[in-house]
Every structure is written in C-alpha cells, then in structure tokens.
UniProtKB/Swiss-Prot annotation:
Principal location listed in the UniProt entry: membrane
Keyword field contains NAD: yes
UniProt domain TIR: residue ranges: 373-520
Protein name: Interleukin-18 receptor 1
GO CC annotations, alphabetized: cell surface; interleukin-18 receptor complex; plasma membrane
Reported modifications of this chain: N-glycosylated. N-linked glycosyl chains contribute to ligand recognition and intra-receptor interactions required for formation of an active ternary receptor complex.
Family recorded in the similarity comment: Belongs to the interleukin-1 receptor family.
Assembly description: Forms a ternary complex with IL18 and IL18RAP. Within this complex, IL18R1 is involved in ligand-binding and IL18RAP in signaling leading to NF-kappa-B and JNK activation. Interacts with SLC12A3 in peritoneal macrophages; this interaction is increased by IL18 treatment.
Cytoplasmic topological segments: 351-541
Membrane disposition: Single-pass type I membrane protein
Transmembrane segments: 330-350
Record note on what altering N297Q does: Decreases the affinity for IL18 suggesting that the N-linked glycosylation contributes to ligand recognition
Length: 541
C-alpha cells in the first residue's frame, strides 16, 4: 500500500515550534527586534571538549571576517556553539561563521524590517493548506527559549484567542472554512530585566476535500494547430486533477516509434485552492507529412473516469493564412492610400479658398436671390479725403467698386455715391447696412473718425447681436496698435483679416481678391469684357 493512502493522511498537524537542536539552514531571514540564535550542528552530536577553541566571525559585504565576542555588542551572547542576539537588529545582516578545529559552518543572515501596522510581518509567514473536515491542530511552543518564556498568546488575524493554557496555547479540531486566516504565536520572555517577544505566523487556507475532485482537461476538446514542414511544435496539455490521477499522450501506432516525437516530463503544482495543476508537453521535431492530419490525444485518467482532448496538425496554407507577398502588397497599398489621404487633406486645407470658388463657379450657386437685400456689401472707410489719406480713399471708392462691381458683378453701397444728400444721415446709414449682406471695413491708422463711428457701431450691432450681416476686415495700411478700436471689433480682428499689398494685389487672380471673393456671398460672376486684368499701381504708404 502506498504511504499516501494510509489513514494518517486524514490528520493534519501544524506544530508551531522552533525546537531544532541546531541551525542547519544556510540562508535565514528573521525580523528585527526579536531574540534569535545560531547553533552549530556538530555540538549536538559530540561531547564538547573544554579545551577545544570555538570562534564566531561576521562578514558584511566586502569587509574581512571580524571575530565576535561579548565586548562586540551588549546584544550579543556567546555560549560555546551558540550565538545569541538580544535582540537581532537590521545592522546584523551579513554572513556568520563558526569555527571549531578544522571545521567551519557558514550562515547568511538577512534581517528584515518589522511591519509596525500589523502583529506579524508578511515576509515571515508560512503558508499551509488544510482540507475541510480534516483534523487541524496548532500548538505554540518554543523549546530553546522555553525556560525564559513567561506566557504565550495565540492570535487569529491579529485578534487574541481566549484559550485555557497560557503557557502553550493549542487548537485541536476538525477544520472548517471559518478557520481560514493568519495564526500568530507570540511568546513573551524576560532576559536581563528586559521584555522580548518571539512571533511565528502561519497562513492557514482551508480547501475542499481534494480526494473528491473530478479531473478535467483545460481548453477546447479539439485543437487545430497550424505548422510548417521542417519546423518544431510543442503541444501543451493541462489539467486539474487529484494527486493520484495520471495524464498521458496517445497517438497512432504508425507514429509510435517516430524518433521526432517526444513526451516531456510532467509538471505539477498545487493551486491556492488546494487542487493539483498538471501539465504535460508533447514535442514534435522536424515536422513531416506523416505528422499532419493525425490525432494526438491527451488523456487524464482517474478512478472515476477519463477526459480526453485532441490536437491535429495542419499545414499553414490549409488554414487560409494570407501569403507573405499578398500581405506585403496589401500593406504597401494601405500605406500609399494613407499618404494620399494625408496629402489630399493638406491640399484641401491649403487651397480651400480656390476649391470653394471653383465649386461656386461649377454649380453657379447664388445666395443673393431670395434674401430680400439690395446690396452685397456696405463699404465703411475714412470719409476725410486728405492728402495723407488719398490712396485709402481711392481704394474704397474706386478700386473696390471697379473690381467687385464691374469685374465680378457685385453691388456695393458707397457712402459718397449712394447716400442721398440732405437726408437723415444716421437713419440712412442704418437702413443701408440692414439692406447689405456684408460690411467691408477698410482699416487704417486714421479710421476711427466721427463720420464712420456710427457706421461701425451699427454694423457691429447687426453682426454680433442680430447676426444679420458678416463683417470683412481689410487692412489697407499696416496697423500695429488697435487700441483705438471697440472691443467687439478687436474680437473680429483676432479672426481672419485681409491685408492689401499693392505690389502683390494688383492682379484679379491674386490671393487678396480670391480671399475677398471667398468671404463675399456666393453669386454668379459676370466679369466685364472691357476690364483689364490688372489694377493701376497703388503704393502702401
């Protein structure tokens, strides 16, 4: 009978004890602030001879061995083969050596910081798994410090358990799911008039009875694996099963002696739920035609039955994969289309004015037929015709009408030409602005005079409040300081402004006139036949 089938498997004993007669582990981790000892193992097997020289050494990093003695630190005590710390601190981390005659034993000690917000330190917790309804026992004892221990307390999740025995508290019961948690044994002891404590913590996980698990293979029952001839493939079969269950591979007899098929060693680990996770890999090297379209079956077997999943190797071309040249060609086409779209968008942004004008010309769109207004634009400009303002005045009353009216077929409202003398000028201006689709403002250094102030205020009211008219700003001469303008016009100034450049704006096909037509209402253009294509030269001064 296998030892794991003995009834003793029904008993789970967790003995929280530090009763080892010597310290055999070469690497040790302890928590700061607790008593700790190192003991050489040979001393427990042989009678120590009084005359035998025993020495303890410490080495930290690149430092040489330093011999330890009671004068090294008040926290260190030497008792033949035992080195005691009262208590151990962070700076005690390092390598320790015990030397007796020609024999030397070495330990590597790592002292970690205590968790001040918990009754235990997570890095010093031992995990244990207990099956539900199995016998569960926790006994708190410490044989080395037993004579110094005053009392011992047992905590669950940092809450003290009220037990009868304060010297060696013990729990004995059948495990239930409610028993899961962190159990800490804390020993309180006195040494040289000081109080110390030693803590040992276990993380107890209660799981279902593992003997009742129904084994199951993970993943789909049928798997098609795309492979290339001459390559290698690994078929991984994983299952959740019981400890005594087995997992194995089966495939056709004709491949049974195939030297390119190998079963790797089974790997098993226990999950946090207490179940066994097994994995077994079938490795097929240098895949040939005989390995294709063959069933490779993975089976898990238990006393309650079996479960099987299958793998079939197929050629990659049979899986309708995209050929490499088709994929490359598709990627090139996709990149070219993306570049073309980016270029098209860039061209549209740069030449949007030309495109809009071309669209208007192509569709012969006219926005002025049904809006009930008389003029396409009211021109606001400086009325004082002084020598220094002569060219600005000429631009407003001669150049704009010549181009927009005679060449492009628009109808403008010019103050000097269209306002009837002797009438109520204020009312007349307000009426003309209401009848206009645009308000063209010719800006200059001397623009804000009393004569144009009302035109501006009325036009801004129509544009910003009633939204019945759109404003077009033309900067005839460079203006650096716009503090003379109303705040509302400054807001418009932050948007698009057309700048007149005499040397570059003379041609009707110049950027200035195209931008002005873009801002004007769409209208069927009827250019004059006798009009020259270039304006007379005007300076910018």
């Amino acid at each position: 009978m296998n030892c794991r089938e003995l009834p003793l498997t029904l008993w789970v004993l967790i003995s929280v004890s530090t009763a080892e007669s010597c310290t055999s582990r070469p690497h040790i981790t302890v928590v700061e602030g607790e008593p700790f000892y190192l003991k050489h193992c040979s001393c427990s097997l042989a009678h120590e001879i009084e005359t035998t020289t025993k020495s303890w050494y410490k080495s930290s990093g690149s430092q040489e061995h330093v011999e330890l003695n009671p004068r090294s630190s008040s926290r260190i005590a030497l008792h033949d083969c035992v080195l005691e710390f009262w208590p151990v601190e962070l700076n005690d981390t390092g390598s320790y050596f015990f030397q007796m005659k020609n024999y030397t034993q070495k330990w590597k000690l790592n002292v970690i910081r205590r968790n001040k917000h918990s009754c235990f330190t997570e890095r010093q917790v031992t995990s244990k798994i207990v099956e539900v309804k199995k016998f569960f026992q926790i006994t708190c004892e410490n044989s080395y410090y037993q004579t110094l221990v005053n009392s011992t307390s047992l905590y669950k999740n940092c809450k003290k358990l009220l037990l009868e025995n304060n010297k060696n508290p013990t729990i004995k019961k059948n495990a239930e799911f409610e028993d899961q948690g962190y159990y800490s044994c804390v020993h309180f002891l006195h040494h040289n008039g000081k109080l110390f404590n030693i803590t040992k913590t276990f993380n107890i996980t209660i799981v279902e009875d593992r003997s009742n698990i129904v084994p199951v293979l993970l993943g789909p029952k049928l798997n098609h694996v795309a492979v290339e001839l001459g390559k290698n493939v690994r078929l991984n079969c994983s299952a959740l099963l019981n400890e005594e269950d087995v997992i194995y591979w089966m495939f056709g007899e004709e491949n049974g002696s195939d030297p390119n098929i190998h079963e790797e060693k089974e790997m098993r680990i226990m999950t946090p739920e207490g179940k066994w996770h097994a994995s077994k890999v079938l490795r097929i090297e240098n895949i040939g035609e005989s390995n294709l379209n063959v069933l490779y079956n993975c089976t898990v077997a238990s006393t309650g039955g079996t479960d099987t999943k299958s793998f079939i190797l197929v050629r990659k071309a049979d899986m309708a994969d995209i050929p490499g040249h088709v994929f490359t060609r598709g990627m090139i086409i996709a990149v070219l289309i993306l570049v073309a779209v980016v270029c098209l968008v860039t061209v549209c942004v740069i030449y949007r004015v030309d495109l809009v004008l071309f669209y208007r010309h192509l569709t012969r769109r006219d926005e002025t037929l049904t809006d009930g207004k008389t003029y396409d634009a009211f021109v606001s400009y400086l009325k004082e015709c002084r020598p220094e303002n002569g060219e600005e005045h000429t631009f407003a009353v001669e150049i704009l009408p010549r181009v927009l009216e005679k060449h492009f077929g628009y109808k403008l409202c010019i103050f000097e030409r269209d306002v009837v003398p002797g009438g109520a000028v204020v009312d007349e201006i307000h009426s003309l602005i209401e009848k206009s689709r645009r308000l063209i403002i010719v800006l200059s250094k001397s623009y804000m005079s009393n004569e144009v102030r009302y035109e501006l205020e009325s036009g801004l009211h129509e544009a910003l409040v009633e939204r019945k008219i759109k404003i077009i700003l033309i900067e005839f001469t460079p203006v650096t300081d716009f503090t003379f303008l109303p705040q509302s016009l400054k807001l418009l100034k932050s948007h698009r402004v057309l700048k007149w450049k005499a040397d570059k704006s003379l041609s009707y096909n110049s950027r200035f006139w195209k931008n002005l037509l873009y801002l004007m209402p769409a209208k069927t253009v009827k250019p004059g036949r006798d009009e020259p294509e270039v304006l007379p030269v005007l300076s910018e001064s």
